[in-house]
Amino acid sequence: MKIRIGFGYDVHPLVMNYNLWLGGIKIPYEKGLKGHSDADVLIHALCDALLGAADIGNIGTNFPNTNKKLRNIDSKILLKQTMSFIYSKNYELNNADITVCIEQPKLNPFIPQMKTCLAEIMQTDKGNISIKATTSEKMGFIGREEGIAVFATVLITPINEIGISCQ
């Protein structure tokens, strides 16, 4: 087996009367993300990157929005299932690098909690997860606060037969 890299992207509309879930935590804000699930765009991009790295489809093929059982599902459940898929292919996360494109709210105060949440689900050290936030300088749908986009890159590495990470 080889070391593999994956790239994920997701975007959701930012609207009134919805909760804002990012990185598995609820962010206090006047708007939230709209989607089939809880619309945690960060976790969705991360799942897409992991699934792509392992060559097992994408978030849409593994968790289709046509599946009524997934309606309003907590995206942390999707990430946990994605990690099960990764482990079944004999891989584990080496590291994840995530960029959230968002005008408001400012995310820096929430990033440590997001990293803790994701590390617990992914059974990895918080130091293996990087989360950064950037604005679009008031340009486009992100700048107008109509949506949030997230880019995620992951590196997954083989696990040897006794379950110890290959280093």
Curated annotation (Swiss-Prot):
Keywords: Isoprene biosynthesis, Lyase, Metal-binding. Homotrimer. InterPro entries: MECDP_synthase, MECDP_synthase_CS, MECDP_synthase_sf. GO terms for biological process: isopentenyl diphosphate biosynthetic process, methylerythritol 4-phosphate pathway; terpenoid biosynthetic process. One of its GO terms (molecular function) is metal ion binding. This is 2-C-methyl-D-erythritol 2,4-cyclodiphosphate synthase. It comes from the Bacteria.
